Amino acid sequence: MEHYVYWVSTALLSLLYLTSAVMYITKRNWVRQALGELGYPGYLVSILAAVKLLAVAVILSRLHVALSDLAYAGMFFHLMLAAGAHIGVHKAKEAVPAFIGLVLLSVSFLTQNAARDIRSPYAPSAVTHLVAAITPDKV
């Protein structure tokens, strides 16, 4: 069951980030304007698009656990800052995707050791056992 939870949450998180990166590339001017309204410089569009694509590639390929964990950390800070920026300019409804991303990120990170051969030292097995305890037996 934990394998499914991991892969579904990771796939949805990846889809969120890939969709966002494609939008940053295809609707560059609109995204620059939106970032400007949040108080960020326009040159971040290209950087964020590249980093989002790289983060997804690193997490899905998991060539190196430390890089994968670093990608999770980067996504965490990005999503927290995105939510905070939207709330800071009184556009809380626009922070909903960031909060959804945080939930998906948390589930993906906390269940990764159950689904991956090489374990992350930062996602303790106790968390995996907790997830196992609250999910129904062999569905």
PLM regions: where:
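Membrane-interface extramembranous regions
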Residues: M1-V139
